[in-house]
């Protein structure tokens, strides 16, 4: 993060990459591990520290600003169901299978939406909400912030909506973020804030 590469001549660009997103998936022969690289004009990606990020994402072809990371799963799923002209119980929500998501999983299940748990790989999880794979309607959960930027870059290419917020577990992480130019530690990031 923040590493300078290249010869110094030519256009300046931001490069975001993860040589193996879903390491455990790959090691165990599971699906959806990815090698991911994205490029934008200088300043085009959120320069995020290696911390967690709360994320919510949906696919393309839907009314703008349909999701809000500050709203409950019930509100977000109600709006999504209305936009898709279906019932909430027809929706599939993908969530990383982590102890930290126990309350979130319970709240989504209370809405009667279906929950699919994944072991790893939230970039692939967010891409699964797009037209390329209509089996997932929404992705919600907390995962790595750099993966959030990569997922946002993918959605900018394929289409979709996403919001994120950095999550800090301690003062060291907050200080690191401030040192990287993050001024509002509670800021809600839109898709275009993450990857423009």
Identify what each model region corresponds to:
Residues 1-40:
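Flexible, acidic active-site loops/lids enriched in D/E/S/T/G that coordinate Mg2+ and/or position polar
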Residues 3-9, 60-66, 109-111, 167-174:
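A generic short-segment signal for beta-strand/edge and adjacent turn/coil regions
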Residues 10, 30, 39, 58-63, ...:
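Short capping/connector residues at structural and topological boundaries
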Residues 24, 63-65, 139:
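A short glycine/serine-rich beta->alpha loop
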Residues 40-68:
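Flexible glycine-/small-residue-enriched beta->alpha junction loops
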Residues 71-196:
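An extended, acidic
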């Amino acid at each position: 993060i923040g590493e300078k590469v290249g010869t110094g001549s030519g256009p300046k660009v931001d490069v975001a990459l993860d040589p193996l997103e879903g390491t455990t998936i790959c090691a165990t022969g599971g699906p959806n591990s990815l090698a991911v690289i994205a490029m934008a004009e200088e300043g085009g990606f959120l320069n995020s520290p290696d911390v967690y990020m709360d994320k919510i994402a949906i696919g393309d072809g839907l009314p703008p600003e349909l999701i809000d990371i500050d709203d409950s799963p019930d509100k977000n799923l109600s709006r999504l169901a209305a936009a898709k002209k279906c019932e909430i119980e027809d929706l599939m929500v993908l969530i990383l299978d982590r102890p930290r998501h126990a309350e979130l999983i319970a709240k989504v299940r209370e809405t009667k939406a279906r929950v699919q748990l994944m072991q790893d790989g939230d970039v692939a999880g967010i891409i699964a909400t797009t037209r390329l794979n209509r089996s997932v309607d929404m992705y919600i959960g907390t995962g790595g912030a750099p993966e959030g930027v990569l997922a946002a870059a993918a959605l900018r290419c394929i289409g979709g909506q996403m919001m994120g917020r950095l999550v800090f577990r301690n003062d060291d992480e907050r200080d690191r973020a401030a040192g990287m130019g993050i001024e509002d530690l509670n800021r809600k990031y839109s898709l275009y804030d993450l990857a423009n």
